[in-house]
Amino acid sequence: MMKKDAESLLRETKAILEGHFLLTSGLHSPLYVEKFNVLQHPEYTEKLCEMIADHFRNQGVQTVIGPATGGIILSQVTARLLGTRSIFTERENGKMTLRRGFRVEPGEKVLIVEDIVTTGGAL
């Protein structure tokens, strides 16, 4: 695949939708990114994660965390490219939490790879 920027990659996979969208935050938006339009194509997912990994490659990231469900794929591929471990959060009682024995140690450098961010409240 030729070198692409993130926006052109998202447009090529028809992940950027235009119209009027009421987001789960209650906000309205003229654009929506349908992440699963990208995630169904492994080669595009890989390229997007390469962009993320390249940006953080020299930051000493030790663990990549993504939210279930869509963020798991992004965090897993990004972690593989960075040579680090990947863990994920799950919603429990309305909050995203580490479960399944996953832990982050004090001082551990973590990269959070979110699948969708509107207000940042779920982080």
Residue ranges and their predicted role:
Residues 1-123:
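PRPP-associated nucleotide enzymes
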